[in-house]
Swiss-Prot record:
The keyword Cell membrane applies. Its main location: membrane. Residues 90-103 have a biased composition (Basic residues). It comes from Bartonella henselae (strain ATCC 49882 / DSM 28221 / CCUG 30454 / Houston 1). This is Sec-independent protein translocase protein TatA. The chain crosses the membrane at residues 1-21.
Length: 103
């Protein structure tokens, strides 16, 4: 008598619920609970998939970003050496700058 959740007490409580609400309502309620559990599991799986995709993209973007920076620094070095070699006087550069300001 001390244990409220004994099997006999649970059966009596279940019978009272069935009598009060009817079999149709109880089965409908249990169906709704099952749908809720399925939706919850589906959403949890979707969230895990989204997080895995974001992690994979972040890892992939980190490896891709490193290589263009190396190529960019090489092209900048080549461009600066070409500019230094092609310029013969400073007066030519200043006249170009003055023309751009006039426009």
């Amino acid at each position: 008598m001390g244990n409220i959740f004994s099997p006999t007490h649970l059966i009596v409580i279940l019978l009272i619920i069935i009598v009060l609400f009817g079999r149709g309502k109880v089965s409908e309620l249990m169906g709704d609970v099952a749908k809720g559990i399925k939706a919850f599991k589906k959403n949890m799986k979707d969230e895990e998939d989204i997080l895995e995709d974001k992690l994979e993209r972040a890892h992939h973007s980190e490896t891709v970003d490193v290589e263009p920076q190396k190529f960019q620094s090489l092209s900048v070095k080549r461009a600066t050496t070409r500019v230094k070699g092609s310029s013969s006087s400073r007066k030519g550069k200043t006249s170009v700058v003055k023309k751009q300001r006039v426009k």
